[in-house]
Amino acid sequence: MPIKRFPLLLIFILISFNTISAQFFNFGRNKVTYEDFEWKIIQTEHFDIYYSGEFLEIAEIGAEYAEEAFDEYKIKFNDIVTRRIPLVFYNTHIQFQQTNITSGFIPEGVGGFFEFLKGRVVIPHMGSLEQFRHVIRHELVHVFMTQKLFNIQKDRRITNRKMPPLWFIEGLAEYWSYYWDTQAEMILRDAVLNGNFIPLKDMLRIYGTFLMYKEGQNFLMFVADEYGEDKILKMMENIWRFSKFEDVIEYTLGETIEEIDEKWTHSLKQKYYPLYQNKFPHTVGSNKITEEGFNFSPAI
């Protein structure tokens, strides 16, 4: 699996099950801006936070979330971002879709993005502070990872910069920004039990999908449990050694990619397959009582 290069200019977080990647840029269409934004700024120790309208209270909460994440990530990454980080907050997703920070169209399923060239993080408030915190933390993982990888390769005078594959980038952002919640559990359990789970070597088949995010997150949870949390950082620190990320994984974990993949897959089967015990397919274990129409409110 070749390592992805820096032309990945925008890194997105998905907030739905839609298959969304950089492919959503629609050429030949014009982005319409409905509102004029009068920007204000909050400056904290590490961030320049831009907001508009009557959004000060939420922006201040976002500032606290960002500083909290900064203190945590400088330890996790064993590195620090020395430049000031611009955070751009929008009051709603509709306003977020009008942003001129990217010329591309932003679908409803995108909950924020990190723009690589100028290092800007752009996030809408969707009405949930928990989700707002999650997205801020997710995007700041991208900021720290980008800085970490840049420093590692700069110190070794490597000019052809390397990046991990998207499943690792997004998987780590999810793993270090949020807990393994019931939605993640539902997605992975469904994939394993219904034959839709994709092993590492075939991860490109689900490139940019919500399943890719959750499989990447779960794989890194597996690495932390099986090989040690420190191995995740080691994979980033070893990226300069190889042209293929599979080789980075093998070198860091000390096993072949096939062995690692098999262990991960087997652990998930052990966890989820027992759920089939005493279960029957609906066509076998139940009787169809209606032939036509839809049952919107079945009686119990």
Annotate each language-model stretch with its function.
Residues 148, 184, 188, 264, ...:
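Short amphipathic alpha-helical interaction/hinge segments
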